[in-house]
Design a protein with these regions (language model features):
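Acidic catalytic/metal-coordinating carboxylates
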Residues: 32, 58-61
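C-terminal output helix
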Residues: 102-112
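The feature encodes the CheY-like receiver
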Residues: 13, 55
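Acidic, metal-coordinating helix/loop segments flanking the phosphotransfer/catalytic sites
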Residues: 29-47
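Alpha4 helix (beta4-alpha4-beta5 surface) of REC/receiver domains from two-component response regulators
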Residues: 61, 81-98, 109
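Hydrophobic/aromatic residues positioned on beta-strands within the core alpha/beta folds
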Residues: 77-78
């Protein structure tokens, strides 16, 4: 499965890249919204791991741009700033959430839940 990981924190990108590759996935990383948008325009991804807060724009801005591209990857919001209200809002849109910090087991469970 081809996965795009978008996070401004290098350590988070590295961890997700390693963990997801170990599970047999193809992983591409992006350090911000512009980099991610360019990759989303040129490649098809089945899953998008997306941070909410990044220096050059928010994850929700990228989601809005994604809709215009007519691309429909499964989305997992991966952020330390997920409130119960936001979690409910994302759930109603079919978007999964993973609150930082998280454990490997939580990552795997969230990915499986998002794909089912």
């Amino acid at each position: 499965m081809k996965i795009l990981v978008v996070d401004d924190e290098q350590l988070v990108r590295w961890f997700l890249d390693r963990a997801l590759r170990k599970s047999g996935h193809e992983v591409i990383t992006a350090s911000g919204m512009l980099d991610a948008f360019n990759k989303l325009q040129s490649e098809d991804f089945q899953v998008l791991f997306l941070d909410l807060r990044m220096p050059e724009g928010s994850g929700t801005e990228l989601l809005a741009k994604l809709e215009k591209l007519n691309r429909k990857p499964k989305v997992i919001i991966c952020s330390a700033f997920i409130t119960s209200e936001l979690e409910e809002e994302f759930k109603n849109k079919g978007i999964c959430t993973l609150k930082k910090p998280f454990k490997l087991e939580e990552l795997n469970n969230t990915l499986q839940r998002c794909l089912s």
